[in-house]
């Protein structure tokens, strides 16, 4: 697949006028952008693989930036991605709150090495759970609390207020390491006893039931104040000593706000996003087009590095 003339022109201009070839990198969201689910399996499209390989060959940083938790990244496509990188993978997880490197252990197993973490404060955890308490007091029991400890080995823990629902929740959310239905006060005590990087509140109830509790969104990601994907990208870019202003960024949802912090923003898919790159913005229809653009960007960067 080749890129269109208009995309080629924008890409050439960005690489010509920026320091992408020497100081930039690539930041990409995962689900819906660089990876897709196919027949129940998460896969990296071939075009994306080829584009990624060209960037890895050049040796410039390539950062993953995802809502997923580290254990999920490792379990779903970590092996496939590591075959492309053949080196530790810079990874921003949990909406910017936990970042580090997916790497091989001495036993040749994939593991996560933390570089930085920004867990919720006790007051932030209590505030999130106060919203849940309000729903429970109002008779709404279709509430799930997903929480993600800083210790990446724990993975994803889900709490339901209905013990009879544990098996159903386990079946529906197979990524969870544990599903619990402890009493609400004990849940709060457990969460306050450890570093929690992100909480996800999921409410499955009719709109009319929720009217009195508008402070609790139907679905709500909770991280430490000021922490999001853009924040995480900036912290990791500093760690990698690359400049986001000279980088490409690819995403597909409104949570991918790092797109507003990169030089060239690549908006993938059909969602109408308002993000604009600092230098320019390119709209792509799918991940196949993203792969073709990444491949071409690596070619142009290599040409600039060789010929100036």
Where are these predicted regions, by residue range?
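Active-site phosphate-binding/coordination module
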Residues: 46-162
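A short, compositionally biased domain-edge/stem linker segment
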Residues: 6-18, 183-186, 292, 297
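Mg2+-dependent phosphoryl-transfer enzymes with acidic/Ser/Thr/Gly-rich catalytic loops
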Residues: 2-4, 21, 25, 45, ...
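Short glycine-/acidic-enriched loop or helix-start segments at secondary-structure transitions
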Residues: 37-38, 73-75, 102-103, 259, ...
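Glycine-rich phosphate-binding "P-loop"
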Residues: 34-40, 217-221
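Conserved acidic, metal-coordinating active-site core of Asp-based
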Residues: 135, 140-248, 254-262
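Non-catalytic pre-domain segments flanking phosphatase-related domains
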Residues: 1-30, 34-35, 46-57
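Conserved Rossmann-like nucleotide-cofactor binding loop
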Residues: 33, 40, 70, 255
């Amino acid at each position: 697949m080749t890129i269109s003339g208009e995309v080629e022109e924008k890409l050439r201009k960005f690489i010509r006028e920026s320091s992408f070839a020497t100081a930039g990198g690539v930041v990409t969201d995962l689900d819906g952008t660089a990876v897709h689910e196919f027949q129940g399996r998460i896969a990296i499209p071939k075009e994306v693989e080829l584009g990624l390989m060209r960037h890895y060959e050049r040796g410039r940083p390539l950062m993953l930036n995802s809502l997923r938790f580290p254990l999920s990244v490792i379990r779903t496509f970590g092996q496939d991605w590591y075959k492309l990188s053949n080196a530790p993978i810079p990874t921003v997880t949990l909406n910017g709150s936990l970042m580090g490197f997916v790497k091989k252990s001495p036993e040749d197993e994939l593991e996560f090495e933390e570089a930085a973490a920004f867990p919720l404060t006790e007051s932030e955890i209590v505030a999130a759970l106060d919203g849940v308490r309000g729903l429970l007091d109002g008779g709404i029991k279709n509430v799930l609390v997903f929480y993600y400890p800083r210790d990446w080995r724990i993975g994803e823990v889900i709490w339901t207020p209905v013990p009879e629902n544990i098996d159903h929740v386990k079946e529906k959310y197979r990524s969870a390491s544990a599903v619990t239905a402890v009493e609400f006060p004990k849940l709060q005590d457990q969460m306050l006893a450890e570093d929690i990087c992100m909480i996800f509140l999921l409410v499955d109830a009719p709109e009319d039931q929720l009217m009195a509790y508008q402070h609790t969104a139907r679905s709500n990601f909770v991280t430490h104040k000021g922490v999001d994907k853009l924040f995480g990208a900036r912290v990791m870019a500093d760690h990698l000593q690359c400049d986001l202003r000279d980088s490409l960024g690819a995403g597909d949802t409104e949570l991918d706000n790092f797109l507003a912090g990169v030089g060239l923003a690549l908006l993938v898919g059909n969602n109408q996003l308002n993000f604009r790159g600092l230098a320019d913005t390119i709209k792509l229809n799918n991940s196949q087009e993203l792969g073709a653009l990444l491949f071409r960007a690596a070619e142009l960067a290599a040409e600039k590095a060789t010929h100036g």
